[in-house]
Structures are given as C-alpha cells and as structure tokens.
Amino acid sequence: TLFPYTTLFRSVEWEHVVPAHAFGQSFKEWRDGDPNCIDNKGKAFKGRNCAQKVNMLYRYMQSDMYNLVPANGQINALRSNYSYAMIPGEPRRFGNCDMEIEDRKAEPRPEIRGDIARIYFYMDDAYPGRGIISKKNRKLFQAWAKEDPIDNWERERAKRIEAIQGNHNKFVE
C-alpha cells in the first residue's frame, strides 16, 4: 500500500492545528523534565507527558478548543508536527482531499488556509512568548488570511467555542 496508516484511513480525530510539539518545546518541563515527572519505576521523564502533568498553562494550551479541529486520522498521522507551507507542483496523494505533505511541510486546501492562519494568530496572541509563529510563517499566514476570509461557519464555530470555553477569539470577527 501507499500508506502504512490504513487503520487510520476512516478515523476522525480531534487534532491540534498548532501542533503541541510547536508550543510544547517552549516549556521547561517539556525540554528538561521536572522533579515531579517520575514514572512508577522511578525513571524521570520529560516531553509532552511531563508538561501535561505539572504545567497548568501547557494543559490550557493543549486543550484550547480554538486549536482543535476534526482531522482524518491517516492524514494527521502523516502530517505529524510539520510546519505549514506552500508546496509547488505537488502531486495529489489523498484522492479528493486537497492536502499535500512533502519534505516535512504540509499544505492545506485553499478553503481552510485562512482558518488555519487565524488559529495560529489566536494561539500566538492568547499565549504570548511561546514562539508559535515564525517570521516566515507570519507572512504566509497573513497572505492566507487575506486569500481565505472569515466565513459563516468559522464565525459560528468561534461563537460556540466562546460559549463553552469562555474566551473570545478576536481574529474571527
């Protein structure tokens, strides 16, 4: 088969637009561990599990509903924690799903690029100092936000999240 992730082909998962890896590395517990991050065999651990265990801000970021979207399990597994980019002349590998993944970069379909950009802007604004958007990606996301303006579903989604989570996303107005 073309993809080894066949069991994920028909699954839908809630996944991060801004990968946990992208903001997780800004946490000391992710990089270095913490005295409270000891497994049941007495071995120290770090990374996502440690940050999740001991850092409340990390848990807020990881569970922020504005950053969670339904995703095809197979495509999400292949996307991994790759950065978004434009991939010129790429072959379509996922049938009708316009998502390209090449050389550790991912290019979403045009109709959601602005949505992705605004999620990045929101996360960067809501959690400052975490290095969520590079200078290069900021320019790309600004272009995507302009090319794919806010639509009715994006507004409705933000309204629903605000009602549950209690905070406003100023990038979807």
Model regions and ranges:
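Short, small-residue-biased leader/transition segments that mark boundaries at the very start
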Residues: 1-8
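Domain-level detector of nuclease and nuclease-like folds
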Residues: 9-173
